[in-house]
């Protein structure tokens, strides 16, 4: 059995809107192929995965539109901020992702990017289905009610 690392070990970036905009059906941990300057930039905290998504192309999984800030000390041999980056998953997981995206309305969204306990960059991706406006309103109402409940409990204790 594969030991999955703790995703809270060193959080780099989190897509906070993913759970608001999508129903996340399943989460998968993926490795990511990076250049040295990208890893150094991530250690400084320069990343954004809010507008990115993943797709299966030619039997490979790619992260598209993920932003990693330029590393200032690597001016000559730096990296492109929004280039396609290859994600590493097992063949079985890749087949599951491909089958999921073949269904209508399903997509692959990045949820969080972090360093695992060995210092390797990992990306938690989710198989997701987009929410309609009414679903988003229900989620927001549920969240507001939870906050109101906590406020009332805090006042009475």
Curated annotation (Swiss-Prot):
Alphabetized InterPro entries for the sequence: SmpB, SsrA-bd_prot, SsrA-bd_prot_CS
Ranges annotated as biased composition (Basic and acidic residues): 138-151
GO biological process per UniProt: trans-translation
GO terms under cellular component: cytosol
Compartments where found: Cytoplasm
Region (Disordered) residue spans: 138-157
GO molecular function: RNA binding
Keyword RNA-binding: yes
Record bears the keyword RNA-binding: yes
Major subcellular location class: cytoplasm
Signal peptide span: none
Keywords: Cytoplasm, RNA-binding
PROSITE patterns named among the record's database cross-references: SSRP
Domain of life: Bacteria
Function text: Required for rescue of stalled ribosomes mediated by trans-translation. Binds to transfer-messenger RNA (tmRNA), required for stable association of tmRNA with ribosomes. tmRNA and SmpB together mimic tRNA shape, replacing the anticodon stem-loop with SmpB. tmRNA is encoded by the ssrA gene; the 2 termini fold to resemble tRNA(Ala) and it encodes a 'tag peptide', a short internal open reading frame. During trans-translation Ala-aminoacylated tmRNA acts like a tRNA, entering the A-site of stalled ribosomes, displacing the stalled mRNA.
Record family assignment: Belongs to the SmpB family.
Protein name per Swiss-Prot or TrEMBL: SsrA-binding protein
Phylogenetic placement of the source organism: Bacteria, Pseudomonadati, Pseudomonadota, Alphaproteobacteria, Rhodobacterales
Gene name of the encoded protein: smpB
């Amino acid at each position: 059995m594969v030991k999955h690392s703790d995703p809270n070990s060193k959080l780099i970036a989190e897509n906070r809107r993913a759970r608001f905009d999508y129903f996340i059906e399943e989460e998968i941990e993926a490795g990511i192929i990076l250049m040295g300057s990208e890893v150094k930039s991530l250690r400084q905290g320069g990343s954004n995965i809010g507008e990115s998504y993943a797709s299966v192309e030619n039997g490979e999984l790619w992260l598209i539109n993920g932003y990693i800030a330029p590393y200032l000390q690597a001016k000559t041999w730096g990296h492109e901020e929004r280039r396609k980056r290859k994600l590493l998953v097992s063949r079985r997981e890749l087949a599951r992702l491909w089958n999921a995206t073949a269904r209508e309305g399903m997509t692959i969204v990045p949820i969080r990017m972090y360093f695992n306990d060995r210092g390797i960059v990992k990306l938690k991706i989710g198989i997701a289905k987009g929410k309609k406006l009414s679903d988003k309103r229900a989620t927001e109402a549920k969240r507001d009610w939870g906050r109101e409940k906590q406020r009332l409990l805090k006042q009475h204790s």
